[in-house]
Amino acid sequence: MLTVVKSHEQLAQELAAEASTVMLLGALDTGKTTLARRIARAATAAGRVVGMVDADVDNSTIGPPTCVGMRLLKDPEQVDEIAPADALHFVGTLSPSRLVLQQVIATASLVERAREAGADLVVIDTTATVSGVAGETLKYHKMELCRPERVVALQRGSEMEPIIGMLQRFFSVEVDVLPAEPEVAVRSPDERAAMRAEGLRRAFAEPLEHWRVRPTVFAPTLPTGLDLERLDSLLVGVHDGNGHCLGLGRLEHEDGTLRVLTNVGEGMKGLRLGSLRLDLETFETKPVSLREVMFGV
C-alpha cells in the first residue's frame, strides 16, 4: 500500500507511536537523518526505547565511516548527541555498491542486536545509493533481512519511483512517500569529504597503540607466502571473539614486522581487512581491491 503524507512531523509522530521497524530511503540530502531523529525524539518522549541503525558507511552520524552503527536511545536528549555507537559492524568501504553483501549483513545484524537489546522501535537510516542495479539490489536485500513493516521514501521529483515499485511488487509493506526535507542543507562533495575525514580522525583519537599481529588473525585468511608489505596502510576492523567490531585499525609494515595501530586493542581477537588504504596525516582514503592486494590480480 502506498501512502502520501505531506507533513514530516505528522508522519514522525505516527511512526513513533505505532511502528516497530521503519526503513528510511532517499538520495543525498533528502532528510533521512533529520526524519530519523524526529521519529526517535517523539518515540523516546513517549517512553519507548529506540534502536537507531545508521547504515550510511560514507558519513555516519553514529559510528565511524566504513561501519554501520547502532545506538540505543531511551531519552530525547540522547537524540541530539547520538554518538558514540553502542554497537558497530565493519563493512570496510565507503561505497556500499562495492560490497553489497557486507553492507546488507551489517545492517541486518545491528537491527537484530537492537531488538535483542530491548528496542521497541528500530529506525534504519540507509545509504544514499538508491538508483540503478546497485541501489535496487542493496535495498531489496535489506528489506529481505530487516523486514520493516513501514518504509518512508524521501524524494525530489520522482527518483524513488523504481525502488518504490519494486518494494511494492515483492514485499507486503506500507510505503509513505514524502518530499525531501526542505530545511536540510545540501552539502558539497568537499564538505562531505571533510566530514568523512573528521569521522576517521575521531576513530583514531589518542591514546593509540601499536599491536604486533600474526598473519593468522585475519579475515579473509592471508594466502601463504604473501608479502606482508602489501598490507601496509590498509584499514581494518578490530574484532573481539564474539563477532563484534570494537573499532578501526590501520596496518603498518616496517622491518618485516606487521602491526596494527588502534585505540581499541584490548579484547582484540581478529582483524577484518577493509578495501581502503588510509593516510593518517590527511585521513583521506584510497579504494583498493583485496584480490589485487593478496593475489596480484
Feature roles, as predicted:
Residues R41, V57-T61, Y140-K142:
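A generic local secondary-structure boundary/capping motif
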Residues K32:
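Conserved lysine of the Walker
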Residues L2-L25, A46-G47, G51-V122, V130:
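Nucleotide-state-sensitive switch-loop elements of NTP-binding domains
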Residues R113-V173:
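Phosphate/Mg2+-binding loops and adjacent switch elements
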Residues L28:
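The conserved Walker
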Residues M1-A17, L24, A42, E149-V297:
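Preference for solvent-exposed, low-hydrophobicity sequence contexts
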Residues L35, I39:
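Hydrophobic positions on the alpha1 helix immediately C-terminal to the Walker A/P-loop
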